[in-house]
UniProtKB/Swiss-Prot annotation:
The gene is folD. It comes from Polaromonas naphthalenivorans (strain CJ2). The lineage of its organism: Bacteria, Pseudomonadati, Pseudomonadota, Betaproteobacteria, Burkholderiales. GO terms for biological process: L-histidine biosynthetic process; methionine biosynthetic process; purine nucleotide biosynthetic process; tetrahydrofolate interconversion. This is Bifunctional protein FolD. Pfam families: THF_DHG_CYH, THF_DHG_CYH_C. The keyword NADP applies. Keywords: Amino-acid biosynthesis, Histidine biosynthesis, Hydrolase, Methionine biosynthesis, Multifunctional enzyme, NADP, One-carbon metabolism, Oxidoreductase, Purine biosynthesis. One of its GO terms (molecular function) is methenyltetrahydrofolate cyclohydrolase activity. Belongs to the tetrahydrofolate dehydrogenase/cyclohydrolase family.
């Protein structure tokens, strides 16, 4: 068996077409959805991510503002900028690119963002809304994973889903989203005694730890759906995920590639969240 690919690029194009159409309807009413992206410092990876987010906005009818600041920027000054953006009616979503310089408390900055503009879904208010099933902004990466499962018509009810990783950005919210769809969810992490025993029971596996080959073919039951959130580089410098793709694709029923899987979906769901923030207005 060779797994079917869940193509994140193709799904992203489809969803971005819908975003552009909805953005055009808003613009016809005099509302241009606006995203502010704040970058502190000169982390090369962050600069690439930020450029991609700004370009995605421009390509799909959203207004974007990129604010760049030196790594020496004080926490107080950054908090003041966030507050100014909170009060700017032309801005519907605010994204502060992580990681921040060590002298700035990232969680404090995240909490300073108005929950109504928290399109990254990292605010405790957004996390709480997800926990109790209330409307709010879902973190973009797990939200994208859910859209990928939806795209293949996968019914999670009664299925066993294993999430490898427990970060606030992916692992924990991913587990809650799967739970909302009536999956039975197991979260695995660095202290899990026997990861293979857990994953072999799984109908769905989401790998999100940032470690190459954390999931191998002998750890996957035939026909399972494998979502690879990881973004790593191999010895040749090529992008790869957390999953041993070549091995696992011979066992799984569905699998996401890296690159071209979850990555483009993350930015697409940021656009969706920003659009929804503007629609809620």
């Amino acid at each position: 068996m060779t797994a079917q690919l869940i193509d994140g690029n193709a799904l992203s194009r489809q969803l971005r077409t819908e975003v552009a159409q909805r953005a055009a309807l808003l613009r016809a009413r005099g509302i241009t959805p606006g995203l502010a992206v704040v970058l502190v410092g000169d982390n090369p990876a962050s600069q690439v991510y930020v450029r991609n987010k700004v370009k995605a906005c421009e390509d799909n009818g959203l207004h974007s503002v990129l604010e760049r600041y030196p790594a020496e920027m004080s926490e107080a000054d950054l908090l003041a900028r966030v507050e100014a953006l909170n009060n700017d009616p032309a801005i519907h979503g605010i994204l502060v690119q992580l990681p921040l310089p060590a002298h700035i408390d990232a969680q404090k900055v995240i909490e300073a963002i108005s929950p109504a503009k928290d399109v990254d879904g990292f605010h405790v208010g957004s996390a709480g809304a997800l926990m109790v099933g209330q409307p709010g902004f879902w973190p973009c990466t797990p939200y994208g994973c859910m859209k990928m499962l939806e795209s293949i018509g996968y019914d999670l009810r009664g299925k066993h889903a294993v999430v490898i990783g427990r970060s606030n950005i992916v692992g924990k919210p991913m587990a809650l989203m799967l739970l909302q769809k009536n999956a039975t969810v197991t979260i695995c992490h660095s202290a899990t005694a026997d990861l293979k025993a857990m994953t072999l029971q799984a109908d769905v596996i989401v790998a999100a730890v940032g470690k190459r080959n954390v999931l191998r073919a002998d750890m996957v039951k035939p026909g399972a759906v494998v979502i690879d959130v990881g973004m790593n580089r191999n010895e040749e410098g090529k992008l790869c995920g957390d999953v041993d793709f070549d091995g696992v694709k011979e066992v799984a029923g569905y699998i996401t590639p890296v690159p071209g899987g979850v990555g483009p979906m993350t930015i697409t769901m940021l656009l969706v969240n920003t659009l929804e923030a503007a629609e809620r207005g």
